Amino acid sequence: MNYLPMMIVFPLIMAIIMNLLHGKEKAVKYITFITAAILIILPFISQYGYYYFGGHGVVNGWVSGIAYLYNPAKQAIIVTLSLIASLVLITGMGEKLKNNMFVTLSLMGFASIAAIVLADDIFNLYVFFEIVSIVQAGLVFLSGTEEAYKAGLRYMIMGNVAAALMLLGIAFLLASTGTLNITDMKHYLLVDNPMIYGGLLLLIVGLAYGAGLPPFHNVKADLYARSKGFISAMLQTYSKFVLVGLMIIILKLFNGLDYFASAHAVLIALGVLAMVFGVVMALLQSDYKKLLAYHAISQGGYVATGLALGTPLGIVAGIFHAINHVIYKSALFLGAYIVSCKRGSNLHKLGGLLPLMPSVAFMVLCAKLAISGIPPFNGFQSKWMLAQAAMQVNMPEIAIIMIIVSIGTFVSMMKAFYLIYLKPVDEETLKEYQNKEVPKLAVFSLFVLTALCIIIGLYPDIVTNYLWDYAKELGVNYYLK
């Protein structure tokens, strides 16, 4: 039996069940733990290859139904997604909020991202793109603050515009090719057709919105900053894998075509702008969660730039960095959540936490070194590959920008670490800290993620070996022609 469809169907079914368990907190917690375990198992027991929903398959050379493609690269992405989702779900069980609604939305988001990553049907991809956009706003609303409601509403308003433009782009491609299946569609994109150019441009608009690239970076950063820390970890994971999923589709359809050269330049520019804007804005922040939110935007720029290069090395580096990023950034957001349980997120009101939580401080420091690209952590491995990919296509200026942004990231992170853990505070503040408990489930999740930062940093091949074959299939050494 092929369990591939269960990666989408199972979380959707569980989301419906959770929605029926309002007020039954104990049942919600038990079922959530079981669901989290199953989410991690499913990617390992599913078979590689194409899966056709509805039993239609291929008819006269055409795919008449919804199709999904599963391969080692997509397995690496979904395993990472499953791990982050499971840890966030477990952490959320220790928080006082509407647990059934939190789990319902989280599972719907998981199913949507899995569908986006697996989709070989562009309209099916769009449907789940819309769902995950609504889910992200809903998760922010759970924070219950006025700022959270405003951030979620702004995101939904912008999403209505971006998603409508993306749907129009899909309509252009359908009108030009006569099919929605991605594998079939790519064979009809060789012709010189203005509608195809328009469709590509509008897909890039949807990509920028979903991933938080300029001009949508401020809206997305506000979404992360106004959520609870563990929910922010989930949101940024969704965004990075939306970016990867949509970029894979764009590369599969257009990479190597002569008219895609301009799109290469646009996508690289968006990635570089996100890197620079993100780190500059992070350096200006006095709120810790806002600082982390802008770093999430900056790191998304690295991913977009690597994938936009379109070469096998660039694609491997981009996907690898996305996987690394969601791991260390989730660790940082969980660290911020633990700190906020003590005394909020205003950096000027924090300090002196090192003696009270030395193990948490150490794990957060590891995650900060990982995001800064310091060896031997995982962030160094993927950033090094990204710089190599830029050099390979004779773009040393991009590699230099990546290094400068990493330096800015390191400065910002060390400043925050000092203000939170090392800055001296008075005795009254220390007593206030001691009266507030540290969420143990969050510490457990932080430990798992920190361990992964170290393990992948020391043994990067355990991830990259899954990526190379698909990257060689998608990649074209366009700039080396």
From Swiss-Prot:
Gene Ontology, cellular component aspect: plasma membrane
Location(s) in or outside the cell: Cell membrane
Membrane topology: Multi-pass membrane protein
InterPro entries: CPA3_Na-H_Antiporter_D, ND/Mrp_TM
Listed transmembrane segments: 3-23, 33-53, 75-95, 99-119, 122-142, 155-175, 196-216, 241-261, 264-284, 303-323, 351-371, 400-420, 443-463
Keywords, sorted A to Z: Cell membrane, Membrane, Transmembrane, Transmembrane helix
Classification via PANTHER family: NA(+)_H(+) ANTIPORTER SUBUNIT D1 (PTHR42703:SF1), NADH DEHYDROGENASE (PTHR42703)
Name the UniProt record assigns to this protein: Uncharacterized protein MJ1309
Organism: Methanocaldococcus jannaschii (strain ATCC 43067 / DSM 2661 / JAL-1 / JCM 10045 / NBRC 100440)
Lineage: Archaea, Methanobacteriati, Methanobacteriota, Methanomada group, Methanococci
